[in-house]
Amino acid sequence: SEACSLAGNQKLGNLTVIFDANHIQIEGETKIAFAEDILKRYEAYGWYTDEISFIQPDGSYKEDIEGLTKVLEKAEQVTDRPKFIKVDTLIAWPTPGKTNDPSSHGSALGVDAVRGLKETLGFDPDVDFPVDEEALANARKVAERGLKAHAEWDEAFAKWAAANPDKAA
């Protein structure tokens, strides 16, 4: 809590936290151990707060990306303090048999659940971790560029350290 309080005191206006309020912990529902109003806690730290629920009034679930975007755009207008956005969700949605189930917190979903999730989302359940070739090639170029930049920095630092042994120590 000290870090969050410090962020509020320092008015870190470019910091945004999106809190996934799925109401589940390893032992069951969070209400057995978590009673405070999280938004009021962050307001007390000096943060701007807002919330959106993906759980609809009728109990159905819809990830409202447009609504979340509006909440984030509104928060973006706040520049004098950090932002805390609470998003009410269902853990493991839309995994068949695991949605809103404490067993999905902190443990593997399992082969059958992953297969069902892939089918639900329209992915081939027999393909593990598909990566687009163009995206992979781009990631490799970025990695190469990073390695080159790191080597150049190491060389420049070594020259500087040799020329400035007192400061480099």
Name each model-derived stretch:
Residues S1-A143:
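Glycine-rich ThDP/TPP pyrophosphate-binding loop and its adjacent helix/strand module
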